[in-house]
Amino acid sequence: MKIAVIGQSLFGQEVYCHLRKEGHEVVGGFTVPDKDGKADPLGLEAEKDGVPVFKFSRWRAKGQALPDVVAKYQALGAELNVLPFCSQFIPMEIINAPQHGSIIYHPSLLPRHRGASAINWTLIHGDKKGGFSIFWADDGLDTGDLLLQKECEVLPDDTVSTLYNRFLFPEGIKGMVQAVRLIAEGKAPRLPQPEEGATYEGIQKKETAKINWDQPAEAIHNWIRGNDKVPGAWTEACEQKLTFFNSTLNTSGLVPEGDALPIPGAHRPGVVTKAGLILFGNDDKMLLVKNIQLEDGKMILASNFFKGAASSALELTEAELVTAEAVRSVWQRILPNVLEVEDSTDFFKSGAASVDVVRLVEEVKELCDGLELENEDVYMASTFGDFIQLLVRKLRGDDEEGECSIDYVEMAVNKRTIRIPHQLFIGGEFVDAEGAKTYETINPTDGSVICQVSLAQVTDVDKAVAAAKDAFENGRWGKISARDRGRLLYRLADLMEQHQEELATIEALDAGAVYTLALKTHVGMSIQTFRYFAGWCDKIQGSTIPINQARPNRNLTLTRKEPVGVCGIIIPWNYPLMMLSWKTAACLAAGNTVVIKPAQVTPLTALKFAELTLKAGIPKGVVNVLPGSGSLVGQRLSDHPDVRKIGFTGSTEVGKHIMKSCAISNVKKVSLELGGKSPLIIFADCDLNKAVQMGMSSVFFNKGENCIAAGRLFVEDSIHDEFVRRVVEEVRKMKVGDPLDRDTDHGPQNHHAHLMKLMEYCQRGVKEGATLVCGGNQVPRPGFFFEPTVFTDVEDHMFIAKEESFGPVMIISRFADGDVDTVLSRANATEFGLASGVFTRDINKALYVSDKLQAGTVFVNTYNKTDVAAPFGGFKQSGFGKDLGEAALNEYLRVKTVTFEY
């Protein structure tokens, strides 16, 4: 059918895309005018497809349709109007014009909750069922005949966002497509809306969202969640307007210890606790609010409302005192040598061993059914008094660490809703940068802004290092066993796997990674890396060494491998999450704490990773993430006296500067993975089909943004022309396109500056006399797309023969048949030595060449075959130190020698 889509937002965009995939012809997209220079997603998508787009600021004047608007609409010849989400008033001349009329999506089960704030009122009224309706438009307000309805359960703590993201958005898109399909098949019903149960409520605005405290707790809870996030339920307290978010009902009946917050009109004062703000209804029942927005717009954890409020010991209720005495009896049974267990009794000083810890934990868990208690809790609260305080906090659901408030950027993309933190991550909290400084991170697929990201300053680096140092020296990270540390890393890997599709989607958005590749490599290998190093945690061990005895006495000498302390990890933009994982997994497995500086142009998966560390239970301060510039954040990390190790992946030029800074500051330990110009030698006796396939992968894998990419191919003369012919044939089959499309082979380059460098690189190659066989230009479409490129006749003196492109540019040079030593000399005539490769069926030749190639990795009859268990790192100016494998652990450990005499 010929369809006019009238609406806006990501929902409108998705409906538009799905209708086109169904084979319908969208003849026009009608959306709202650009706001602050930013076009609506529906309009952007339609313009990209060449569909006419109209952005009328109004459709009628003085109650009459504008003739010009009607004429432009009628010229399209639409057979059906589809209104997925439309905030404008559309004249009946337009509504009734098509052969099949118009259908509208409404996010409630009509006739209930007619009006623009239907989702809000579904929650405010405490409806147990929610859903959406698709109806035939008429001249009433949401009164047209019903075509289709779908319902879902409304969860007790659902908010507008959670209900929309879980059901109304994804299922609503499917519902609109289904409705159009029914119309096309002539099977669409027209069911009059019943009058019984019909309601209409007005638009929820800030001025109408004030909380009425004279009602039960459940009604207050429904009011808060029904206005979360927009417009926000508010009250006046402490001489300012406070807006409440993230409400849950508290059914425990126990009022946690906290500080009173007087609220005018409330039945009782609120109580600020470590879990959040306890509020009371007029029925004396409670609800808990996790987040508060202050009058100046700043969002804070409700538990932090009274900054500087001292933490005091909990006063136990009668029931809790009974529990405490039962636990005292458990301690007494485990510690028979202790006459009487007092608050000051120390579990371990009283003779308990690790096996007793297990017994204590299991007995207490059985005593307190449903309690989550772990071995490390005993080590962190080893006296009876501290243990009871910890136990009661857990029983009350009052987490001592507190919960992190995350201001997400939410996006509906790749058939899912992704939630991305965008602030700095310091000491277990997402916070704004000093001075609230931010910058834009760009989607390379179309050049659009994804979101604003906090831009770290020097003071932020100092705060992050201080948090990491405190976590290392005083926190529980250094006190838990190596095996428990491994368990936390395994849990983190599991969470990364649970979020694998979301992480891959973020990599595609932020870095231009092809989604299908990101699932397997960018994210898949990241998960494997954390699992691999989690297994190493309890296998890091020293040795005993026989030395000359100090006769007549004897000696025992042993070594211990210890973490170095606070580490700075500076990662590149080509594999944002994988490069983070390669270094951070080994760093954490060794017992260090870390400050991570992601590449400024690709910060988002690092911030999502930070969120997952919290969910995994990694203690606060162990992992910190600072998006920002290398010249500021990276430099401060290199200079900081409390940072003991820098792990860096990037250019040789910057690596040299970091090495110098580390030496001058405090002689930091350094590992560097730097530039490359990896040679790939293809002999005439190779399997040519495999050589072509792997040669393509060696250059074009991940758009050529690959540190070990084959920077130069040496092809034996007798097969050179056939090799080039086959490569060009394969290049022309590659699909360049949106990285989220499942059939895309080649996505956009990472950022605009890099695209421009690739253009200059190819222009210089042509200027110096190399033959440009194909490619060499930007793809004529929005975004930072560059054509897969092939150069031949490349001589050793040329710029492109010596310098890395870091892009999809294949550099091919000939070498004379049988001249193995000369081609080896040419391959090694570079200051780089990251990787290399050889293709031959001759095992003797393969062994000889692999011996002679001066590179940290040599691939024989394969390429790009890295593995988490195999050490990875370069020679010469490609750096030193290893990622992956057991060798990587040594980069984050120091060896201590201990000698006894007896």
Curated annotation (Swiss-Prot):
It is found in: Cytoplasm, Cytosol. The modification O-(pantetheine 4'-phosphoryl)serine is found at residue 354. (6R)-10-formyltetrahydrofolate binds at residues 88-90, 142. The modification N6-succinyllysine is found at residues 38, 660, 767. Residues 417-902 are annotated as: Aldehyde dehydrogenase domain. GO terms for molecular function: formyltetrahydrofolate dehydrogenase activity; oxidoreductase activity, acting on the aldehyde or oxo group of donors, NAD or NADP as acceptor. The modification Phosphoserine is found at residues 9, 629, 631, 825. The modification N6-acetyllysine is found at residue 882. Its EC number is 1.5.1.6. NADP(+) binds at residues 571-573, 597-600, 630-635, 650-651, 673-674, 757, 804-806. Keywords: Acetylation, Cytoplasm, NADP, One-carbon metabolism, Oxidoreductase, Phosphopantetheine, Phosphoprotein. InterPro entries: 10_FTHF_DH, ACP-like_sf, Ald_DH/histidinol_DH, Ald_DH_C, Ald_DH_CS_CYS, Ald_DH_CS_GLU, Ald_DH_N, Aldehyde_DH_dom. It catalyses: (6R)-10-formyltetrahydrofolate + NADP(+) + H2O = (6S)-5,6,7,8-tetrahydrofolate + CO2 + NADPH + H(+). PROSITE patterns: ALDEHYDE_DEHYDR_CYS, ALDEHYDE_DEHYDR_GLU, CARRIER, GART. Residues 1-310 are annotated as: Hydrolase domain. One of its GO terms (cellular component) is cytosol. The N-terminal hydrolase domain has an NADP-independent formyltetrahydrofolate hydrolase activity, releasing formate and tetrahydrofolate. The C-terminal aldehyde dehydrogenase domain has an NADP-dependent dehydrogenase activity. It catalyzes the oxidation of formate, released by the hydrolysis of formyltetrahydrofolate, into CO2. PANTHER family: ALDEHYDE DEHYDROGENASE-RELATED. Cytosolic 10-formyltetrahydrofolate dehydrogenase that catalyzes the NADP(+)-dependent conversion of 10-formyltetrahydrofolate to tetrahydrofolate and carbon dioxide. May also have an NADP(+)-dependent aldehyde dehydrogenase activity towards formaldehyde, acetaldehyde, propionaldehyde, and benzaldehyde. Homotetramer. This is Cytosolic 10-formyltetrahydrofolate dehydrogenase. It comes from Pongo abelii (Sumatran orangutan).
